[in-house]
Structures are given as structure tokens and as C-alpha cells.
Amino acid sequence: MKTIKTNILSLFGRSPQQLVRTKRSKVKNLENIHPFVSSRSFATLWMTIVILFLPSCITEEVPDNTPQGNFEALWKIIDTKYCFLDYKNKEYGLDWNEIHRRYQNRLTDDMTNKQLFQVLAEMLNELRDGHVNLMTYHETSQYREWYDQYPTNFVDTIQRIYLGKDYKAIGGIKYQILEDNIGYIYYGSFSNAIGESNLDEVLNELSICDGLILDIRNNGGGLLTMSDRIASRFTNKKVLTGYLCYKTGPGHNDFSRPEPIYVEPATDRVRWQKPVAVLTNRHAFSSANDFVSKMKVMPQATIIGDKTGGGSGLPFSSELPNGWSVRFSASPLYDADMNHTEFGIEPDIKVSMSTEDMSNGKDTIIETARKLLKEKKE
């Protein structure tokens, strides 16, 4: 018998494409694990996580390094630690025990590592979770159907028409003032951080505008702290934006009580007081999905576009006997009404880019936002 360890993963806010393919992921910035609370309470929250997951951090015995042993280790990790098994059973009939029987039949003692990887990756894809990955030294499995089966609703060549040649860029943000005096911000990845002072500069410059478009289409996530930092510029009071539960035992429904998540107004910073339209598509995932959940409760905000890609579980990682790593969602995130956001968040105004508009170099979603903001001004 060999041993296996379960480790907290610091890459929650990232889509699979943003994962660094390493055998083990080290926590570099503890605040990136849980940005849902203010930094003042982070230390307390971190101790809560450690206490609740202490049993998962203790060395456990697992089967030997064989195809069957690695299969059993992976299946058990998901069975005891993955946080959406019961929810997905209700949503689309996921039966993890049936999955075990079906995929076990595909194992052979003499199968290659490549064949084993294929079987295990396909088993994990049954979870329909973009935050679940099997990682070797050379390969990472990915579940892509959370966006593959949907319209793109974003064309970068058309977006560049709106930005123009004289747009400004700070950190990961590009911004411009459109001809109808509507401010336009594009934030394509929360992996590209923007500092508080730079954010002040952007909002100050756009303060002359009648409304603001905040476009996060194709934002696959990144730093969760960016979700909280941006959202804090759109409220003047502490506001409840959601809840988070922690896995407390091996049962599919072993969770802590829901812990409230708040966004507090950015103190001594520029805050936006006018209407704002947040643009989304299916590629808005993970921490971008979390940002939309926060903005949903802001009274001056309207979400426009397509349903987001989801990805709301707080990920952990574990190691198999052969050294492969698995990332999985371990703690569910809910919106302010205690609804799951794992499969995405519906917009307030659902609209897709039309073929006619695209042929004319127009973005239907941006145009819808401009029309709305003009109406709100009147």
C-alpha cells in the first residue's frame, strides 16, 4: 500500500486553460483561495478551512500503483470530496456508483499510461465541470462542453472597431469613450490584475460618461481578488452577494452551514454611481462567473448577453498513487438567494450577436447595452 495526500489548491479562479501543468500546485497567495471575504477576515476564514478540511490533509492509505489502484483512488477522491455529486444527480441523473461500474470494465492490467489517462479523463468528464482536471507531467484533461455547444457571442475584430486605435490600457483593462458618451471597459482575464490606483484612474476618466459598459466576455477567470475588487466599486454599502459551504465529511451531503459572502464598498476610492451594463457569454467562467453573481445584486447593474459558463466550486487537489494530480470542486458557491451557480448565471437581458449585425461590423450585445444606458439616462 502507498500513501496519498490531499492539498488545498490555489488556482480556484482559473479556467482549465490557465492551469500550470505541474505535479503539485503550491499555494503562493492564500488570499487567492478565498476572495469572497474582505482581507480583514481572511485569517479567520483560513483557519476555518484548515479545521474543516484537516481530515483531508492527513495521509491516507490508497491502493498500489496499478491501473485498478489508480482508478479506485480517483473514484474515491471524487466520491468523498467532490461537492456537486448530489446536485448533479438531481440535475441530470449523475450516478457515481454506476460510473464506477461502467469505467471499471474498461480497465486491464497491461494497459498503458496513455490508455489509463484516457479512461480516467473520460470518467471525470461525466461530472461536467470545467474546474475538474486530471494532470500528468505532459497532459491535462479538460471538459469543454460548458462552452463548445453554445454560440461564441464575441468577435474580437468587431470589438476592436469599438475600441478604436486610440483606446487606453491599464493592467488587464482596455477602455474607451464611445461617441454617444458611453464608457466602455473590456476586461478579458482576471489573471491580469489591475491595482486600486489604476482602477481609480480608469473610473475617474470615464466619470464624464452617461453610463458604463463592462465587457467580460471570454474572461475565463483568474484571480478571485479581481472579482471582489471590481465589484466593490459599484456599491456604497455592504451587500450580501452569496453563500459558501465547506465539505465536512465523506458523505455527498456533508457540508457546513452556509457562510454569507459580502462585498463592501471600496473605501476612499472612486466608486461608479451611474448605470452599468455587464456583458457576458458562455466563456465567462470561474471568477468571472463569481463577478457576475456579485453584480447581479447591484441595483444600478444590468447583465446583458448570454448565460455565463459557471464554475462555482472552490477547488482542491489530490495526488494519485502514480503521481498524477486531480483538481476538483470541493466547496459549493451559491448566489444571494442560495441558488447554485455551477452551471452558469442567466443574464437580465438575453441577447446573441446577429449575423446581420456582424456582417455590418456591429456587436449586437454592445449595441443592446448602449440602447439601454441611453434609455436610463432619459
Q: Model segments located where?
A:
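Flexible, low-complexity junctional segments that flank or bridge functional domains
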Residues: C57-K247, D254-P260, P275, S317, ...
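C-terminal "post-core" interaction segments
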Residues: I58-D79, K114, I182, G220-E378
